[in-house]
Amino acid sequence: ISACLVGSEMCIRDSYNYEEELMIKIAWYYYIENLTQQEIAKILGINRIKILRLLDKAKENGLITFQIRNSNAKRFHMENTFKELFHLNDILIIPSVPSSDSLNDSLAQAASMYINQRIKENSYINMGYGDTPSRILNYLAQRSESPINVISLTGGVNYYLPNTESNVFNARLHLIPCPLILSSSFIMEELKKETAIQRISKMALISDFTVVGIGGVDTNATIIKNSILTPDDYLLLKKQGAVGDILSHFIDINGNLIDTDLEKRLMSPALTDIEKYNNVVGVAGGPHKIEAIYAVLTGKYLDVLITDENTATAVLDLYQSKNNIDTERKDGALQ
């Protein structure tokens, strides 16, 4: 008996249906790729009992039938393509939504669900600077059944504080108590010598997950909207080839660091230190982030990417053009 998947066309309204997407993915591996439940558990980072429960639920809900719904199959093919091209451990592609604010919120919800499925009691999670990581933190702290420990990777405390509208915030915060960008390199170096900051830096190395946003080089970027950098700073960065940032380090299209005076005053881990962290999850989407996401992937800074379908398609198109690939796309995958 052959079995395939059917999922109703999913769109994000009040929340992203992460469990349904997970059921589809498990059913695909089990029925289409003939993997064992133990193999699927290892790939997805969840236990075998949960795999069995979700397979049963998928049958009850009618997600397992005799057809593959094109929208879900396309995303799944695209996810596999990203893993192969950019050497990712995992990727989650959600349906796209019209506005950038709705997209950021949908991505934040999806990321919080993804991480919440994989963390244990009293887990430690590193958080980068920015609007999307801040939203993820608030959703995660509300969803987590047991307290989580959140480590700030950068200065700029405001983005690590709970949203005042949250009724529940189940997280212990370990913050670097200083601005994101200091007035001088001397002050930055002296602060890094402080025992409290060194303790936080050491905690970051043993955290279970590391969550980072990916910034574009445009006037809507968090770092410029908050007047941390001026429009003139951005123009200069663009002239130097910057297409985006990760942990507030600006990089070119190939993922190389743009070395400026800003680097000497930035309270953030060195770009070369990112590979020392466990399970680095990058979360970003939207047309203004395409080059930035491509650059971060090319630089091999991520273990996991969470983005939306339109952005993922555009990043693959950019990969094709940069690598002079003249191929047809079938179901979201490069052939």
Where are these regions (language model features)?
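Single conserved hydrophobic/aromatic residue that forms the stacking wall/gate
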Residues: 1-12
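Conserved phosphate- and dinucleotide-binding cores of soluble alpha/beta proteins
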Residues: 15-27, 32-39, 50-56, 62-68, ...
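N-terminal active-site beta-alpha-beta segment that forms phosphate/nucleotide-binding
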Residues: 27, 31, 35, 44-46, ...
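Compositionally biased regions
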Residues: 3, 113, 322-324
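Short, surface-exposed alpha-helical recognition segments that flank or form part
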Residues: 14, 99-103, 284
